[in-house]
Regions:
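Class I SAM-dependent methyltransferase Rossmann-like catalytic core
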Residues: 1-49
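A structural alpha-helix within SAM-dependent methyltransferase catalytic domains
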Residues: 38, 127-131, 154
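Conserved catalytic/acceptor-binding region of the Class I
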Residues: 141-209, 217-230
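Short catalytic micro-motifs in class I SAM-dependent methyltransferases
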Residues: 115-119
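Catalytic cores of nucleotide-enabled group-transfer and carboxylate-activating enzymes in metabolic
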Residues: 91, 99-101, 105, 130, ...
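A short glycine-rich, Lys/Arg-flanked "PGG" loop and its adjoining helix->strand segment in the class I
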Residues: 124-139
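C-terminal lobe and adjacent flexible extensions of AdoMet/dcAdoMet transferase-like proteins
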Residues: 188, 208-289
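Class I SAM-dependent methyltransferase SAM/SAH-binding core
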Residues: 39-104, 110, 124-125
Length: 289
């Protein structure tokens, strides 16, 4: 069954291409995601001679992993030509379809994806493709935005449009809940799946500054059914008013929530620990007392 088409893939590519040169100006989320990746790698007692980065943006991960003692070469994949060109500064980089990996990819020790999967229509399908690229006992690691991301902006825009327009048009993408995405690793055949979530609060001078930075990140509105015209000025002004009234700080700033969900799994291998079968334990609780 075909996945629901929530996003316009052509618009996603257009936004990534248009703002590729400016992503580095507002890359704090990408840098945090890369830091979480490196923290995870540092805890793992093994090396990764080859790694594939899916949705690599400007090669943030490949740049950070240069010289890392546990990582060899990094292959960066992205659907935007300018992102591929930027990532190629740090190693091999190729084009990919928004939701499909190239057919001729080599098997690899690790597949990662940092802040990309939340823009994909068929998340289960892409995770399965990524899992198939792994060698036995290979690492899958991804970070995506979760459902609490931009919850303040979503609520403020919804209220403003209902008041002024009498209805709501799509502006902010629906994002996955951690309870939903954790099961996708098992569906992809990955062992020892783990899902973690952290909520980050970032302050901005205004709603308009927040929305400007979202565009520079390549995270603008790419939803199917979005209005082709610009959002009306009175709606935007009312959104800013509601946002400030409900969430604004004493010093005139506004907070914005970003939920980052981390997914970790491993391709199956005989060397991995396995849970005991029920009833196969060699001792009982009474032996402890």
């Amino acid at each position: 069954m075909k996945a629901p088409q929530i996003f316009n893939n052509a618009q996603i590519c257009h936004m990534r291409e248009r703002y590729a040169a400016q992503m580095g100006e507002v890359d704090f989320l990408h840098q945090l995601a890369v830091a979480r990746l490196i923290e995870r790698l540092d805890l793992i007692r093994r090396d990764f001679s080859h790694l594939i980065d899916v949705g690599a943006h400007n090669g943030f991960a490949a740049e950070a992993l240069q010289g890392h003692e546990k990582v060899g070469t990094v292959l960066s994949l992205d659907p935007a030509p300018s992102c591929v060109a930027a990532a190629s500064q740090y190693g091999e980089a190729h084009m990919m379809d928004v939701e499909r990996l190239p057919d001729d990819l080599p098997k690899t020790d690790a597949v990662i994806s940092l802040l990309y999967l939340h823009q994909v229509n068929d998340v289960p399908g892409l995770i399965q493709q990524m899992a198939r690229q792994l060698r036995p006992d290979g690492l899958f690691f991804a970070i995506l935005c979760g459902g609490r991301t931009l919850q303040e902006l979503r609520a403020s825009m919804t209220q403003a449009e209902e008041e002024i327009m009498g209805g709501v048009s799509p502006h902010i993408a629906p994002m996955a809940d951690i309870k939903d995405v954790g099961g996708l690793l098992q569906r992809a055949g990955l062992a020892m799946p783990v899902a973690d979530s952290e909520l980050l609060t970032v302050t901005y001078s205004s709603v308009f500054r927040l929305m400007s930075e979202l565009k520079l990140m390549g995270e603008g509105n790419a939803l199917q059914g979005r209005r082709s015209s610009f959002t009306r000025r009175d709606v935007m002004m009312r959104t800013a008013e509601i946002y400030t009234q409900k969430y604004g700080t004493e010093d005139g700033q506004i907070p914005a929530s970003f939920e980052l969900i981390s997914l970790t799994g491993w391709s199956p291998d005989a060397s991995q620990p396995k849970a005991l079968r029920p009833g196969s334990a060699k001792s009982s609780m009474t032996d402890l007392f």
